[in-house]
Amino acid sequence: MPELPEVETVRRGLQPFMEGATVVRVEQNRPDLRFAFPENFAERLSGRRIEALGRRAKYLTVHLDDGLSIISHLGMSGSFRIEAEDAQGLPGGFHHERSKNSLHDHVVFHLMRPDGASARIIYNDPRRFGFMLFAEKGALEEHPLLKDLGVEPTGNLLSGEVLAALFKGRRKPLKAALLDQRLIAGLGNIYVCEALWRAGLSPMRAAGSVAGEMDVMERLAGAIRSVIAQAIAAGGSSLKDYIQADGALGYFQHSFSVYGREGKPCRNPACGGTVERVVQSGRSTFFCASCQT
């Protein structure tokens, strides 16, 4: 399932084609995805201008000129495809002709951009685990999907001091604490494994046991920020279904230090250990027992 870097990459890919554009019409090819589409979904979007594209945790948000917002989640296999004349040469792009919709193209946004050029933004989702919901004017931050989300792990929002406060008194393992969306929003299995390796911390260690060690908290916060920033710069990680909005694959998976590397040498040159895999809360955890303590 796409994590924060993948969703941010999609947002950045869509932004030049969607922000400022007017929705001419929307093709809705089925009544539901994971959830039913909002009532009058296509009708309420027609004629609206897209003012901004945002992201909160793993959710893409589309903000319209009447105050309505779309909250979208890619699920397991969702992707957006851009078709526009100036997308010529990009995977999924077209020039002087309209491509044929595929079986799993469930929503097509027909847009008129500020310069008068047209574009189509196509949402494709074979497994249909994604969704698109509305948040009414002024209600986005209090939407049930968003209101309880924790701090974003980007920029300077996440610090050692913040982590220490979040982890204080918590008995759950570090990995479980980092995956708790109420504490830190947008982190997933891949990037938590990678950040813990960079910080030299065991995923099984109790979160509260390190909350008082400010140097450790700063090291972990820095590891999280750097992993997320590098993954965004690499276009995310393509393991199964994820592609960028222009059809390209992310390539951060080539930089994995532990994730998916069970039995292979640890990439810490001072270590000499081997990457191990254990299951925590039903998810695979990859780590090096030699250098993560």
From Swiss-Prot:
Pfam families: Fapy_DNA_glyco (PF01149), H2TH (PF06831), zf-FPG_IleRS (PF06827). It catalyses: Hydrolysis of DNA containing ring-opened 7-methylguanine residues, releasing 2,6-diamino-4-hydroxy-5-(N-methyl)formamidopyrimidine; 2'-deoxyribonucleotide-(2'-deoxyribose 5'-phosphate)-2'-deoxyribonucleotide-DNA = a 3'-end 2'-deoxyribonucleotide-(2,3-dehydro-2,3-deoxyribose 5'-phosphate)-DNA + a 5'-end 5'-phospho-2'-deoxyribonucleoside-DNA + H(+). A zinc finger (FPG-type) spans 257-293. Its cofactor is Zn(2+). Its EC number is 3.2.2.23, 4.2.99.18. The active site is at P2 (schiff-base intermediate with dna), E3 (proton donor), K58 (proton donor), R283 (proton donor). Binds 1 zinc ion per subunit. It comes from the Bacteria. The keyword Transmembrane does not apply. DNA binds at H104, R127, R170. InterPro entries: DNA_glyclase/AP_lyase_DNA-bd, DNA_glyclase_Znf_dom_DNA_BS, Formamido-pyr_DNA_Glyclase, FPG_cat, MutM-like_N-ter, Ribosomal_uS13-like_H2TH, Znf_DNA_glyclase/AP_lyase, Znf_FPG/IleRS. Keywords: DNA damage, DNA repair, DNA-binding, Glycosidase, Hydrolase, Lyase, Metal-binding, Multifunctional enzyme, Zinc, Zinc-finger. Gene3D superfamilies: 1.10.8.50, MutM-like, N-terminal (3.20.190.10). GO terms for biological process: base-excision repair. One of its GO terms (molecular function) is zinc ion binding. Belongs to the FPG family. HAMAP family: Fapy_DNA_glycosyl. Involved in base excision repair of DNA damaged by oxidation or by mutagenic agents. Acts as a DNA glycosylase that recognizes and removes damaged bases. Has a preference for oxidized purines, such as 7,8-dihydro-8-oxoguanine (8-oxoG). Has AP (apurinic/apyrimidinic) lyase activity and introduces nicks in the DNA strand. Cleaves the DNA backbone by beta-delta elimination to generate a single-strand break at the site of the removed base with both 3'- and 5'-phosphates. This is Formamidopyrimidine-DNA glycosylase. It comes from Brucella canis (strain ATCC 23365 / NCTC 10854 / RM-666). The gene is mutM.
